[in-house]
């Protein structure tokens, strides 16, 4: 079976030589893409990058990584190496907030306005609960990390999806509890005490449950993935 891959930079497709993508739970992922690009194309290698993959036998491809290029390094006259962070890394900047009688919707709306990010919030009571005040004195990451306690959200987490939208809420209200996965041990390429290596699964992301364990990390390169776990 053939694994199809597609890399877009600012809406333009580039030939992909190799990739190394790492996704994490509650923090932005990182990626390095080596692409076919001449010296004349170098100036265009800025902005948003989107990486999709899918097996040839399946219908369509799945967006696996959406991020921003931090820098592009020349490999030779025909290739560039792109160092990228997941789009949620836009929160890694000073975004002061001071909102009285704030709801989680208010907080996420303020962060969206400051970063251009799009947040997904489940229709649950904690989305509209008002806190006396919400103060964010540091980065957007700090504000999101505090939100779970401030608004009383059990098993709180936030996670960037493949399309760049960011889920914020209880893990129980995310897509994962109703979609547990199982892979027989014989299909693991390699196995350790806290990680497993498997053939690429385009929909696999941190937060998913595989064989009764919650995934905390997914690292993809070539045709395989390494997933790191915690017990559910």
Predicted regions and their residues:
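Short solvent-exposed loop/turn micro-motifs enriched in small/polar/acidic residues
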Residues: 44, 62, 150-152, 203
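Short beta-strand/loop turn elements enriched in aromatics
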Residues: 2-28, 112-117, 163-189
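Surface-exposed, non-catalytic interaction/assembly patches
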Residues: 93-102, 169-209
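Noncatalytic linker/hinge segments flanking ATPase motor cores
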Residues: 75-76, 107-114, 122-129, 161-163, ...
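Short acidic, glycine/Ser/Thr-rich loop/turn "cap" segments at secondary-structure junctions
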Residues: 89-102, 126-132
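Assembly/oligomerization scaffold segments
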Residues: 1-89, 198, 213, 217-232
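Short beta-strand-centered interaction patches in the first periplasmic/extracellular domains
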Residues: 79-80, 84-87, 123-193
């Amino acid at each position: 079976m053939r694994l199809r891959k597609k890399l877009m930079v600012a809406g333009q497709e580039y030939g992909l030589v190799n990739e190394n993508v790492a996704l994490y739970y509650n923090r932005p992922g990182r990626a390095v893409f080596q692409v076919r690009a001449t010296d004349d194309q170098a100036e265009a290698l800025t902005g948003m990058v989107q990486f999709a993959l899918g097996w040839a036998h399946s219908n369509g491809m799945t967006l696996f990584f959406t991020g921003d290029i931090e820098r592009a390094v020349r490999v030779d006259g025909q290739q560039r190496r792109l160092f990228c962070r997941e789009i949620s890394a836009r929160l890694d900047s000073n975004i002061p907030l001071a909102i009285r009688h704030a709801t989680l919707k208010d907080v996420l709306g303020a962060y969206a306005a400051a970063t251009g990010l799009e947040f997904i919030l489940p229709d649950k009571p904690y989305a509209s609960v008002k806190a006396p005040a919400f103060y964010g004195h540091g980065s957007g990451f700090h504000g999101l990390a505090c939100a779970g306690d401030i608004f009383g959200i059990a098993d709180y987490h936030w996670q960037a999806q493949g399309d760049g939208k960011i889920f914020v809420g209880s893990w129980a209200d995310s897509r994962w509890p109703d979609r547990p996965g199982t892979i027989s041990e014989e299909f693991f390429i390699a196995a350790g005490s806290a990680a497993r290596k498997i053939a690429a699964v385009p929909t696999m992301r941190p937060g998913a449950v595989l064989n009764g364990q919650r995934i905390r990390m997914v690292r993809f390169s070539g045709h395989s993935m390494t997933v790191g776990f915690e017990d559910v």
